[in-house]
């Protein structure tokens, strides 16, 4: 039986003598709405408060901590506080992923995944917060833990602690993949071909702000009342765009992105139903805007097909450019794309941030084909291995599409394999491979959507001639006649090739 207790109270505060300390006495964040005149005004406000989502052309919703709200008050914009009381669902059964686990249950579930499928699943403890709660991630691959010629793929969810649809969908996705391996061909192909990483809960302090037993008092911000999705280095605004130090959660994921060269990723949120693709921070379109629209529509269209009418059709039929929606500075999506050369978009999975548990099965049915399809995209596009033409050693090479790439849309091949994975909309492209100390190489490549184009490339070192000279200086060639005497003419005689290590090779020379 489901019982829902108390929802939202709208409380107008039209005067500006509000006691700020009292307003934040119970919780370090508030939720409020306000009207705005222009998109430019909304984007300016986004620099001081955390815009959540807007329901129409002139009404916005936002979060703020005490410092942020104090700045907002200086604008003298009228607002309404939305008092979010605990929403409690009582569910007597815990079957088929229709519930929110306690924190300890979450730990146990993640541990059980790795224990039950040790040959294809590994649990990584990325870090521990001051609260003692952990950031966990599972890695899934047919040769888990080994570096292979395959893309690395990342799903994370709930960096906003009260946006929990993706939390359950991620857990269920892990379970579905592990149990389907070698029983379902698509799942088997994904596990065999991709290095899969899934983090269901990126902000456990926010999710379990009310205690480890339930998520009904979850908060958007972390325990320090910082919005983690405004806390990353930004392409336009540089380091610390929110004015805060990098949080422990942020540093954990910065470290993960440094250690694993992810090719594609997605960041799961809630509060709307839409695919949000880059950029968030500025109005520039990415070099691969047509590819982003293609994969975003693929996700949204599949959700619509596998759900009841009205799901996942927000904004542009379920997709939006981030900046066109509202500007975000310090978001993880832009960080991953610009600084880590990884294709990441943001999935807003549910209008309800913490959906009724009875709705979780419907959300799964609508989203799991899309989640798998997006994962499969990491196998497509242009891929190959870059090596040294002399030694055959793998190289970390810059890979750039001529007259196409801009704003850090190029990529690099990854050591220790030298593999690269470049995702791009179908067409013909000139692709340049370059590295210091090597001659650049440009090749023409034809690409089809949802297809693989393999191009292995060898780069020639700039000092090829000197290397050859060094090789031949180790060789001494003598021309001798049939009696063993040295011959100056070098005609119709025997060559004795003597190397410095003392070995002699005999070769008969006939003219």
Please tell me what each predicted stretch does.
Residues 4-14:
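Sec-dependent N-terminal signal peptides
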Residues 147-297, 301, 305-309, 336-349, ...:
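Active-site/substrate-binding loop(s) of hydrolase catalytic cores
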Residues 382-389, 457:
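A short, amphipathic beta-strand motif
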Residues 390, 458-487:
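Residue-level detector of functionally pivotal "anchor" positions at catalytic/ligand-binding pockets or at interdomain
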Residues 393-395, 401-425:
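Short, acidic Ser/Thr/Gly-rich low-complexity loop/linker segments typical of extracellular
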Residues 426-437:
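A short, solvent-exposed beta-strand micro-motif common in secreted/extracellular proteins
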Residues 436-461:
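Structured interaction patches on ligand/partner-binding surfaces of diverse proteins
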Residues 494-511:
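C-terminal tail/sorting-segment detector
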